[in-house]
């Protein structure tokens, strides 16, 4: 018995026992699904991927929309956005590596993490720009935002 026949059989004989390399029959994994569609292929796996991707991206939308409309960033913590961008960037890289290894798998997660990271970068860039403009004007960020982006409240009609 030579080495290549051992690899082709999927069973290595070691002493009195055997090491099984092809465990798909024992784990209930259907190899044709994995080859055709990628991972995860179980309906619950796809459901959780879709819902998770929507929730992750949807969590950033309200903050991004609010900042883009009001241009006010004085209440945003720089550290939180730096950590958020770093985490989302690493998760996006991980997800895209999963997509490259297994086409079809993790594509929604990869898109969600990438879009969330881009949205976070936009908000962070606005925060840094406002902070730099305020410093150049010799003001605090709050004073700068109050001067250039006043909060306009509609008064009730009499």
Curated annotation (Swiss-Prot):
Keywords (A to Z) from UniProt: Cell membrane, Membrane, Transmembrane, Transmembrane helix
GO cellular component: plasma membrane
Protein name, as recorded: Uncharacterized protein UU008
Species per Swiss-Prot/TrEMBL record: Ureaplasma parvum serovar 3 (strain ATCC 700970)
Predominant location category: membrane
Mode of membrane association: Multi-pass membrane protein
Location of this chain's protein in the cell: Cell membrane
Membrane spanning stretches: 45-65, 76-96, 106-126
Family, per entry: To U.parvum UU007, UU041 and UU042.
């Amino acid at each position: 018995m030579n080495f290549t026949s051992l690899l082709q059989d999927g069973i290595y004989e070691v002493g009195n026992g055997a090491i099984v390399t092809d465990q798909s029959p024992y784990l209930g994994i259907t190899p044709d699904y994995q080859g055709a569609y990628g991972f995860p292929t179980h309906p619950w796996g796809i459901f959780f991927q879709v819902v998770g991707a929507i929730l992750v991206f949807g969590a950033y939308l309200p903050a991004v929309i609010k900042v883009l409309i009001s241009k006010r960033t004085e209440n945003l913590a720089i550290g939180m956005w730096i950590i958020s961008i770093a985490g989302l960037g690493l998760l996006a890289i991980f997800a895209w590596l999963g997509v490259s290894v297994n086409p079809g798998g993790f594509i929604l997660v990869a898109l969600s993490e990438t879009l969330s990271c881009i949205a976070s970068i936009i908000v962070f860039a606005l925060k840094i720009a406002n902070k730099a403009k305020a410093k150049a004007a010799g003001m605090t960020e709050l004073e700068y935002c109050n001067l250039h982006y006043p909060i306009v409240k509609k008064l009730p009609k009499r």
